[in-house]
């Protein structure tokens, strides 16, 4: 093999080894959480620790789904059935789904219509709006928490899921609109003009020509909005004070309250929290890449 070939092979080995190491570091906490969630309580703190459970059990997942969980059991302290965070897990899961889907639907609807208007109609200030919107996204979301909380108090929306939906729309809409604006710019206007010449109305062109063409951008913006809404902790912690209306990110923190932490139950909750977004991302990742790559070259 020539020196150049040896150098190329060495580069590939270093690159793939580095990528493998980075992937392992990223995935190991999730693998350990999955392993812990499948272990019985007696094995979680066993020495030496094992990544692969010696005996697999689904009791932690069953406790979360059914809402039946017990506190720590030992020889001098029998397990007692009491009000535990596991009893509210399904409720929190549904709350998170409602808030995530609701805020995503509103953000995508507004950003798509706004992006279409900014790229297809001529009016004063349209060239500045996208840049001002992305500036709004660059501001840390924690700055908006107190003003939005005061607004929710005035509207009597505190401790409601609607307050979370509106809060998440306020932090996801700027980037979604900028992303859709960049994508709409890449769609040739000649396609719409041809449909208009054929007798289609503006709404028909938008529904049957623009939206299907802009689908990768819409999916990319939707994934972004869903991830932000699903993972947020700050707004849920400030806006909600009832245990029934909590979302998963806030509710899971209640597993740490008290003198004992049920690590098997906690890890099972963390694994279940990652499942919805992991499924969405894996199913739509090719659209995500196409959406974020849109606008690099204007059509």
Feature annotation, model-predicted:
Residues 1-4:
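N-terminal Sec/SRP start-transfer signal
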Residues 6-7, 12-299:
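A structural signal for multi-pass alpha-helical bundles of membrane permease subunits
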């Amino acid at each position: 093999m020539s020196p150049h070939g040896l150098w190329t092979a060495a580069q590939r080995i270093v690159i793939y080894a580095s990528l493998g190491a980075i992937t392992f570091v990223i995935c190991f906490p999730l693998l350990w959480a999955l392993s812990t969630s499948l272990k019985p309580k007696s094995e979680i703190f066993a020495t030496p620790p094992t990544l692969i459970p010696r005996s697999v059990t689904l009791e932690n997942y069953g406790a979360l789904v059914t809402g039946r969980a017990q506190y720590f059991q030992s020889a001098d302290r029998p397990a007692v059935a009491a009000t535990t965070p596991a009893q509210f897990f399904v409720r929190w899961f549904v709350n998170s789904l409602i808030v995530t889907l609701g805020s995503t639907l509103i953000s995508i609807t507004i950003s798509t219509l706004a992006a279409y208007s900014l790229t297809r109609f001529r009016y004063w200030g349209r060239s500045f709006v996208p840049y001002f919107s992305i500036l709004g996204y660059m501001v840390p979301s924690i700055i908006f928490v107190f003003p939005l909380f005061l607004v929710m108090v005035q509207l009597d929306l505190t401790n409601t899921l609607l307050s979370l939906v509106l809060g998440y729309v306020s932090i996801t809409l700027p980037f979604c609109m900028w992303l859709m604006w960049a994508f709409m710019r890449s769609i040739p206007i000649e396609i719409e003009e041809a449909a208009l010449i054929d007798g289609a109305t503006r709404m028909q062109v938008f529904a049957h020509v623009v939206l299907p063409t802009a689908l990768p951008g819409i999916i990319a913006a939707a994934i972004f909005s869903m991830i932000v809404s699903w993972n947020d902790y700050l707004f849920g912690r400030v806006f909600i004070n009832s245990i029934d209306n909590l979302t998963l990110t806030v509710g899971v923190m209640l597993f740490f309250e008290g003198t004992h932490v049920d690590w098997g139950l906690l890890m099972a909750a963390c694994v279940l929290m990652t499942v919805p977004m992991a499924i969405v991302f894996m199913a739509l990742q090719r659209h995500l890449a196409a959406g974020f790559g849109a606008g690099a070259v204007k059509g």
